[in-house]
A protein has these predicted regions:
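Acidic catalytic patch
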Residues: 46-51, 71-100
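Acidic, PIN/NYN-like endoribonuclease modules and their adjacent C-terminal/linker elements
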Residues: 1-8, 80, 103, 111-137
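Alpha-helix capping/helix-boundary segments
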Residues: 15-16, 51, 90, 110, ...
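Short, well-structured N-terminal submotif of metal-dependent ribonuclease cores
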Residues: 1-47, 62-69
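Residues that scaffold the ATP/ADP-binding catalytic core of kinase and kinase-like folds
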Residues: 18-20, 58, 131-132
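Hydrophobic helix-cap positions at the C-terminus of alpha-helices
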Residues: 37-38, 77, 97, 113
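Short beta-strand scaffold positions
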Residues: 11, 46-47, 85, 105, ...
């Protein structure tokens, strides 16, 4: 690491889930400490779209949180200072669409990623095929 370069850490789903669910409280407190460190500028937390997808799915399926609430909570968390989201535009659009529409986060992310490259989507999923600008088969 060169002088003046801030350290970066890749964020794992476990920290997101603990912070958003407060389950269990002692791990939620540790997670909050990690996020505070990023907010204070001690380091940057990088978030991969796969981590967002796993978080969305787990909050919906295991914790039974309504999709709109999941979308809003994840967006608020990702908007915090010190957070760097990879493929940010596609992630945010997918959160919005998955929170309000009929597509899963992964399908919405795939669709928005394909559009960003002016590509199509190869799928047998009817909902995704209808959403995609171009598709196969």
């Amino acid at each position: 690491m060169g002088p003046g370069r801030i350290e970066r850490f890749w964020l794992d789903t476990s920290l997101i889930l603990r912070l958003l669910t407060n389950d269990p409280p002692e791990l939620a407190a540790k997670s909050l400490e990690v996020f505070r460190g990023a907010e204070e500028g001690r380091y940057i937390l990088r978030v991969h779209p796969l981590v967002v997808a796993e978080s969305f799915y787990t909050l919906r399926s295991f914790y039974q949180v309504p999709k709109q609430e999941v979308s809003q909570a994840l967006r608020a968390l990702l908007d915090r200072k010190g957070i760097e989201v990879l493929e940010e535009e596609a992630v945010y659009l997918a959160l919005q669409e998955a929170g309000s529409g009929g597509l899963s986060f992964v399908d919405a992310f795939l669709s928005h990623s394909a559009e960003a490259f002016d590509d199509g989507v190869a799928t047998l999923d009817e909902k995704l095929a209808k959403r995609a600008t171009k598709n196969l088969p």
